[in-house]
């Protein structure tokens, strides 16, 4: 994201995710995001979240298992990281989960 609009974009995107990314039963019409396919993938996404935190990225939203689904499924809260550098694992590798990294350039 271009440095001059970075902060404004991050705030707008965060609000958009809050109102759009409805987590829940994938068979309901209002659901935007269902569960991870397997426990292995669920654990993999959570490990990327831990990697982002430990490498110094800023967790803006999500970053945890999503619990409000009646105890069924492998749900992850929509996750947003900012201040991501190009040498970080979460920047270099595809997560395949509800996960966005935002970095800036001049």
What is the role of each PLM region?
Residues 3-106:
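NAD(P)-dependent aldehyde/semialdehyde dehydrogenase
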